[in-house]
Design a protein with these regions (language model features):
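FMN-binding flavodoxin-like domain, especially the glycine-rich phosphate-binding loop
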Residues: 2-4, 14-17, 21-38, 48-141
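Aromatic-flanked redox-active Cys/Sec active sites in thiol-based oxidoreductases
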Residues: 8-12
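Helix-turn-helix
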Residues: 41
Length: 141
């Protein structure tokens, strides 16, 4: 049974809904999912998980949230090399530029989905199904 961390920040609840669906997919596939906020994850946490899904919505001019999530991610970024990770988040406008930039930052890691998983606004059932698929994929990776 693989232990998967799902580390996310959500301002409106959309990215939180994605995180919960990813956790559901992990559990349905027989894994263990640990949901946590950015203040609960450090670079030392990597050793406890087979994979980590990081989730953050697009903020401002298509950037990561910069008060909680951004500083945490900046701190763990040097340890990403060779780690199994996935990226996900929601957005309200634009075309996903923040996710493309974020994926490029993570080039040294083993990205489960090289393009990340993005959903526009509140996830619908189709979007939640994609999140569950991501969770199952992480549990079986």
């Amino acid at each position: 049974m693989k232990n998967i961390a799902i580390v996310y920040w959500s301002g409106t609840g959309n990215t939180e809904a994605m995180a919960n669906a990813i956790a559901e997919g992990v559990r349905e596939a027989g894994g263990t999912a640990a949901l946590m906020g950015p203040s609960e994850f450090t670079s030392d946490s990597f050793r406890n998980y087979a994979a980590v899904a990081f989730g953050c919505p697009a903020m401002g001019a298509e950037e990561l949230e910069d008060l909680e999530f951004g500083p945490m991610f900046d701190a763990v970024e040097p340890q990403l090399s060779g780690k199994n990770i996935a990226l996900f988040g929601s957005y309200g406008w634009g075309d996903g530029e923040w996710m493309r930039s974020w994926c490029q930052r993570c080039a040294a890691a083993n990205l489960f989905q090289p393009e990340g998983l993005i959903l526009n606004e509140t996830p619908d059932e189709e979007g939640l199904a994609l999140c569950r698929e991501l969770g199952a994929g992480l549990a079986n990776w």
